[in-house]
């Protein structure tokens, strides 16, 4: 059976969770989260996880599954998500992928190759080389695998090192190996609204995070875990950690959270516009819910017919 996955994405703060709750009133759905930070336990406020009431209304998967200091990547996400997807279908429910992490979306719709084992020696050498000559790894990637370089952000050292590791270990480009693992068809629904409205929602959400206890959440985390973890470089956490370290005041920290979140939302939209056949809706428009319910129902009916 050729499964057509349903993905609902959009910039942070646009209202994906709120819309999903509304859709659940019409369809028997379960959500597979596509948020690379909501997978971590104890990081609730700063990652804007669904609240207990929303989680009660709609079953969510891939939230609170690992500790902040545990290793996780897009390959593991893809593997776990597909198993959960099968279980949801067996229960007669509709699996809906929801979130804005581009790497997870790529893992599902483009495939994500991870067959080459990690080589810590190569990784250490590459990291050392990068420290000695900043920017050299980017140049190497552009030379060895231009296609991968075009997809990987210049500041994304994790993916840069992984791509170079695969090439140095196998002599093959990771971009070519990934093409061997193409995923099935998908329907990508993108939520977006007027930029001024989106930015205002982001600003208000940042203030509410502080009101709801983000500072205490960060304090508890860095008491239990190393504050230099990559996990804590997440927007909202890194700024509060710097505030707690006395680098700047709370007002500046809040300003930076707002600004950095707006910049992140803009990058998400740039990424999502690459998908030519995506379907875009404004979640604030009254007819949006009905249209998306129709789309999901159509895919689900098609799936049911294929099973018959």
Swiss-Prot record:
Domain of life assignment: Bacteria
Keywords tagged on the record: ATP-binding, Magnesium, Nucleotide-binding, Transferase, tRNA processing
Subunit structure and binding partners: Monomer.
Protein's job: Catalyzes the transfer of a dimethylallyl group onto the adenine at position 37 in tRNAs that read codons beginning with uridine, leading to the formation of N6-(dimethylallyl)adenosine (i(6)A).
Interaction with substrate tRNA (site feature) positions: 101, 123
Residues covered by region (Interaction with substrate tRNA): 35-38
Name of protein: tRNA dimethylallyltransferase
GO MF terms held by the record: ATP binding; tRNA dimethylallyltransferase activity
Naturally occurring in which organism (per UniProt): Fervidobacterium nodosum (strain ATCC 35602 / DSM 5306 / Rt17-B1)
Record gene name: miaA
GO biological process: tRNA modification
Residue ranges that the Swiss-Prot or TrEMBL entry lists as coiled coil: none
Ligand binding (substrate): 12-17
Catalytic reactions on record: adenosine(37) in tRNA + dimethylallyl diphosphate = N(6)-dimethylallyladenosine(37) in tRNA + diphosphate
């Amino acid at each position: 059976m050729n499964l057509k996955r349903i993905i609902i994405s959009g910039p942070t703060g646009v209202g994906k969770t709120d819309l999903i709750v509304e859709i659940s009133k019409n369809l028997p759905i379960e959500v597979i989260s596509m948020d690379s930070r909501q997978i971590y336990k104890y990081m609730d406020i700063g990652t804007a996880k669904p609240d207990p009431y929303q989680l009660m209304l709609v079953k969510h998967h891939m939230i609170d599954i690992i500790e902040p200091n545990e290793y996780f990547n897009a390959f593991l996400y893809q593997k776990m998500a597909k198993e959960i997807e099968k279980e949801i279908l067996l229960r007669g429910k509709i699996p809906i992928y929801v979130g804005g992490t581009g790497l997870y979306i790529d893992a599902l719709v483009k495939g994500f190759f991870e067959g080459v084992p990690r080589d810590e020696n190569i990784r250490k050498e590459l990291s050392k080389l990068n420290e000695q000559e900043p920017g050299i790894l980017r140049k190497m990637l552009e030379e060895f695998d231009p296609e991968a370089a075009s997809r990987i952000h210049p500041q994304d050292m994790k993916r840069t090192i992984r791509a170079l590791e695969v090439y140095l270990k196998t002599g093959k480009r990771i971009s070519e190996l990934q093409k061997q693992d193409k995923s099935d068809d998908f329907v990508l629904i993108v939520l977006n609204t007027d930029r001024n409205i989106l930015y205002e929602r982001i600003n208000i959400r940042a203030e509410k995070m502080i009101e709801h206890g983000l500072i205490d959440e960060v304090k508890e985390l860095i008491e239990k875990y190393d504050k230099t973890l990559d996990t804590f470089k997440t927007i909202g956490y890194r700024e509060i950690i710097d505030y707690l370290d006395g680098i700047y005041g709370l007002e500046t920290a809040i300003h930076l959270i707002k600004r950095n979140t707006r910049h992140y939302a803009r990058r998400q939209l740039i990424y999502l516009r690459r998908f030519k056949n995506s379907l875009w809706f404004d979640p604030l428009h009254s007819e949006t819910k009905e249209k998306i319910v129709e789309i999901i129902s159509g895919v689900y009916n098609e799936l049911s017919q294929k099973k018959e």
